[in-house]
């Protein structure tokens, strides 16, 4: 019985790391919005796998404790303590490391209000699909169906708090000559030269009433309240710039 149990436990410990490695193969994140590429596994994965292993060990104790000798019991209890300790230490170390190497030496909480207009129609982002989350986007960069960009967490570089990162986070894209926005009706795509009112249209992006170039690279101002946080307006229209209202609201 002792040998079977130890073989079973060894298989679990061998299979678990292998599954972690394969679960991260092929992952790509243009803006690295979840910091997963910095560490062997993400914090969420560490908690998930640690919880699974912890649960397996608890089940083993519940169903097999009467058949275990003292040495086996000590091994199982040691593994339970080790799993809990290692996960906790991993979370502490990665959190401290992220804060030390971050751009601001700690987490941020910035906001910017926005509107998106395509051919005189205001475009609303697709509502969150997850029952457990009200975020349109990811933890670091998202909206809450409130026309407000939320930057919440640790940023490592300016790129992670750019407008390009926001559009990437919500499942769209932004460039100097166009944008793509996921909506409840599907993906809305508009690029310079597409028609509005049967006339060639162009993308304009205004920040606090001022026209900007290369909007994907624009970094959101570091403020929690709006104003002084940015008020950003995306306008795709056939109208001349003189005919456009550059302000939101």
Where are these regions (language model features)?
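Alpha-helical transmembrane segments of integral membrane proteins
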Residues: 6-7, 77
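Intrinsically disordered, low-complexity repeat segments enriched in small/polar residues
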Residues: 5-6, 18, 23
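Positively charged n-region of N-terminal signal peptides that target proteins for export
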Residues: 1-4, 73
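Ubiquitin-like/PB1-type beta-grasp interaction modules and other compact soluble beta-rich domains
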Residues: 21-249
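Residue-level detector of intrinsically disordered/flexible regions characterized by low predicted structural confidence
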Residues: 4-5, 47
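Bacterial N-terminal signal peptides
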Residues: 9-17
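Intrinsic low-complexity, intrinsically disordered segments enriched in polar/basic residues
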Residues: 2-3, 13-14, 142
């Amino acid at each position: 019985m002792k040998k079977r149990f130890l073989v079973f436990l060894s298989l679990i410990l061998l299979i678990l790391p292998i599954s972690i490695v394969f679960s991260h193969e092929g992952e790509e994140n243009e803006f690295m919005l979840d910091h997963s590429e910095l560490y062997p596994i993400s914090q969420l994965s560490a908690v998930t796998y640690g919880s699974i292993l912890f649960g397996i060990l608890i089940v083993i104790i519940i169903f097999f404790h009467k058949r275990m000798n003292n040495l086996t019991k000590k091994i199982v209890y040691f593994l339970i303590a080790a799993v809990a300790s290692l996960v906790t230490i991993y979370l502490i170390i990665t959190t401290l490391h992220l804060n030390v190497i971050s751009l601001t030496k700690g987490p941020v909480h910035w906001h910017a209000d926005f509107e998106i207009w395509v051919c005189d129609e205001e475009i609303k982002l697709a509502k969150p699909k997850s029952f457990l989350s009200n975020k349109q986007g990811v933890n670091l960069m998202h909206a809450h169906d409130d026309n407000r960009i939320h930057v919440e967490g640790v940023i490592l570089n300016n790129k992670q708090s750019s407008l390009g990162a926001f559009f990437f986070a919500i499942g769209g894209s932004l460039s100097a000559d166009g944008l793509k926005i996921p909506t409840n009706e599907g993906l809305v795509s508009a690029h310079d030269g597409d028609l509005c009112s049967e006339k060639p249209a162009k993308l304009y992006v205004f920040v606090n009433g001022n026209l900007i170039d290369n909007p994907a690279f624009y970094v959101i101002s570091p403020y929690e309240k709006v104003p002084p946080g940015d008020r950003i307006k995306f306008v795709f229209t056939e109208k001349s710039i003189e005919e456009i209202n550059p302000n939101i609201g």
